[in-house]
Amino acid sequence: MSTTKPTQQFAFDRRRFLTRSAQAATFMGLAHTAPAWARGADLHNGAIRAGFDEVSGRDIAMTIGEGPRVVQGRRGHAIAVNGSVPGPLVRLKEGQPVRLAVTNTLDEDSSIHWHGLLLPFQYDGVPGVSFPGIKSGETFVYDIPALRQSGTYWWHSHSGLQEQAGHYGPIVVEPAGADPVQADRDYVLLLSDFTPLHPHTIMDKLKKGEGYFNYQQNTWTDDYPLSGEDRRMWARMRMMATDILDVTGSTYTYLANGRGPEEGLEYLFNPGERVRLRVINGSAMTFFNVRIPGVKFWVVGADGQNVRPVEVEEFQIGT
């Protein structure tokens, strides 16, 4: 991930950097003025936007759609909510009810699951388990009573492979009382992955051959070939020695707030400010190791829950 170097009057304050988490922990970052993509500007000439807007209040409208998506010049198909990937940041308030009207404009069923939120079962958003799903052309209203929690979470589709196509976004539930984590700036960083291949194509290839996307397989001409004993061991396990992940960076482009590594992120901040960054892993199957070279920070929350602050140089966030 590339970053734009801040001007000289901006600098990291190592001892005051905060973190908080969603499906994980939180770490880096800081925007004095949000760049165009973070504000939802259309940089892709009519294609789905990168970055997300924010929705809040007692009545929230969300629309599920689809269209072309371009990441670092690679074009693919995307399912987006309110026209962007990730979809909008849903900002809620502990103790307050909310009505979320979700309209499905796809040609297939869809859904939204509110990951980590404690809700009546009929609003959990898992088709075939807690509700029938949202049919094409229909609107489903999640009429959620007063929320009983605060913290960082995320929402995503529970229909087919729509999540990998871009159907996901962040949730922040503000506490009813004073927030135990005080910060001058508070931002969301949603990590995910992108491929121009359709998710069903990836699934089809993996079902036909689990090593289809493994482009680093051992050969007899390797400088350090496996011994016969090692080869027999891997054969007994029915595994390849280089099978770290079913799909790796050879196929995926890894994203931060919908932007690829070459597209850049810029976070500006003022000296001495306390910054909280809420990190969410919205990827299909990727684990991220997060660090800021030369900077220590504090993990102050995990899975939406406040935790005793832990100073770290790096953390791993799963999906």
Regions found by a protein language model. Name each.
Residues 1-16, 23:
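N-terminal secretory signal peptides
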Residues 10, 32-68:
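C-terminal segment of N-terminal export signals and the immediately downstream linker at the start
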Residues 18, 107-108, 119, 128-184, ...:
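Extracellular/periplasmic metallocenter environments
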Residues 60-61, 67-74, 82, 105-131, ...:
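Extracytoplasmic copper-binding redox domains, predominantly the cupredoxin/blue-copper superfamily
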Residues 62, 100, 112, 157, ...:
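Divalent metal-coordination and catalytic microenvironments
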Residues 66, 75-77, 191-270:
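Mobile cap/lid helix-loop segments that border enzyme active or cofactor-binding sites
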Residues 102-106, 280-282:
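Asparagine-centered strand-capping/turn motif at beta-strand->loop junctions
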Residues 122-135, 233-319:
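Histidine- and aromatic-rich segments of cupredoxin/plastocyanin-like copper-binding domains
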